[in-house]
Amino acid sequence: KFGVADYGMNVWYGGLFDIAERLEDLKAIGFDGTERLEAVSEADAVHKAAGYRRLGMDFSTCRGPDVQSGIRWTAALGKSYVWIQHRGMGRDTDFEVSCRYAEALCRAAGRWGVTASIHNHMGQRVESQQELEEFLKAVPEAGLVLDTGHLSMGGGDPVEIVKKYHDRLSVIHLKDVYL
């Protein structure tokens, strides 16, 4: 499946959009869905999930107003992973502290049958290939939302990471990066 991370559209339109119109436009240009369904309540999550289904589209994970809600709603909607995303993943956070937070999130997600997956990203705690590999070694329960563009910009080799950690991939973000 090919989806799109619609974060850029949120930024472009300042968060002011109609989700049904957005999905129809994405479907018209060939996308199968988006990576994340973002919801503010259980009812909002169900309403938006029904909208995706009505259009024959899909999403991979659900983000709620807090980590626990995102995990629960992701599980309830039959999806398999959530992002490891919290205040403990900032660039200046100690690596061991970030790993401890991530391990707790992996346990919490695991109780719901969901994998917590690290998203490597410039400016975040896990940015370079070395940091990504150290993180995956330190937090063996974590899946991987591999961002090829950010890894390349950090000097890494996405193909090597895929070969080495294919069994931990939750999703891959493909980007066209000019180095």
Q: What function would you assign to each model-found segment?
A:
Residues 68-101:
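Glycine/small-residue-rich loop that forms an oxyanion/phosphate-binding "nest" at active or ligand-binding sites
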Residues 40-49, 90-103, 125-128:
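Active-site-adjacent beta->alpha loops and helix N-cap segments on the catalytic face
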Residues 14-21, 69, 93-100, 127, ...:
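Alpha-helix N-cap and loop-to-helix initiation/capping positions
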Residues 4-8, 36-39, 59-65, 84-86, ...:
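A cross-domain feature marking catalytic cores of carbohydrate-active enzymes
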Residues 1-80:
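N-terminal pre-domain/capping segments
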Residues 21, 47, 69, 104, ...:
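Short Gly/charged-rich anion-binding patches and loops
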